[in-house]
């Protein structure tokens, strides 16, 4: 009798219905293609844990869009620590008006991001294999984004040298957002940040609220 090899395999979360109507057919098709790539290769390539497939759409793909309303039209965006592509690739799929720079230090993740950009035909996206600190002084952006990269006290000194005057750091954060802000007071003063706010966001296709931290330069 052969063993059931699928018994311990995690299930893959199905996409919510109505995506084509909400995002438009082209963007929805790319989101689904990206999801399939992650289902097929995410665990094998060390991009997502196997159990993350059980909440791929709600926790990762759609959750990334909580920051989309905070990004102005035709903005330049730097995504620090893009990893598997959250939120940078997701933003690129739904916002073709943006110019997006994905910043990632790990070679295998850089290779993955380059493959995704090519396969999904995202000409408005560039991938940089470097640390954010190395890009400082070479380029400046309207918005810097980040998700699950570092606490704010570390993220702020990486992000603010990359921002244009009046630019904004927009970060996806969890329950510790207030604590992270308190712990980052020294960096907030150092970089003359005049506004740090927390926003609770509902995201289409999910039942969970997401917290977004926005910090503005003077």
Describe these PLM feature segments:
Residues 99-104:
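Conserved SAM-binding motif I beta-strand of class I
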Residues 1-74, 78, 93-94, 108-125:
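Class I SAM-dependent transferase core
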Residues 84-97:
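Conserved SAM-binding loop of SAM-dependent methyltransferases across substrates and taxa
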Residues 133-143:
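A short acidic, Gly/Pro-enriched loop at the edge of an enzyme's catalytic core
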Residues 166-176:
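Conserved beta-strand signature within the Rossmann-like core of class I S-adenosyl-L-methionine
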Residues 176-218:
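Active-site capping/gating segments
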Residues 95, 163-165:
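Helix-to-beta-strand junctions that scaffold the AdoMet/dcAdoMet cofactor pocket
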Residues 80-82:
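Conserved beta-strand/loop positions that form the S-adenosyl-L-methionine
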């Amino acid at each position: 009798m052969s063993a059931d090899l699928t018994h311990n395999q995690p299930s893959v979360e199905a996409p919510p219905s109505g995506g084509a109507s909400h995002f438009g057919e082209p963007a929805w098709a790319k989101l689904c293609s990206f999801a399939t790539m992650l289902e097929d290769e995410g665990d094998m390539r060390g991009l997502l844990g196997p159990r993350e497939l059980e909440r791929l759409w709600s926790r990762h793909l759609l959750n990334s869009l909580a920051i989309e309303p905070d990004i102005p039209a035709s903005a330049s965006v730097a995504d620090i620590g893009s990893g598997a592509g959250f939120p940078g690739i997701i933003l690129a799929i739904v916002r073709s008006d943006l110019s997006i720079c994905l910043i990632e230090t790990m070679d295998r993740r850089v290779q993955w991001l380059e493959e995704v950009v090519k396969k999904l035909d995202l000409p408005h996206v560039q991938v940089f294999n470097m640390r954010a600190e190395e890009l400082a002084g070479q380029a400046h952006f309207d918005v810097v984004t980040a998700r699950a990269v570092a606490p704010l006290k570390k993220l702020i000194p990486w992000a603010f040298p990359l921002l244009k005057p009046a630019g904004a750091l927009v970060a996806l954060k969890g329950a510790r957002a207030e604590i992270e802000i308190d712990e980052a007071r020294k960096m907030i003063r150092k970089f003359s940040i005049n506004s740090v706010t927390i926003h609770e966001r509902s995201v289409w296709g999910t039942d969970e609220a997401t917290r977004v931290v926005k910090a503005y330069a003077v």
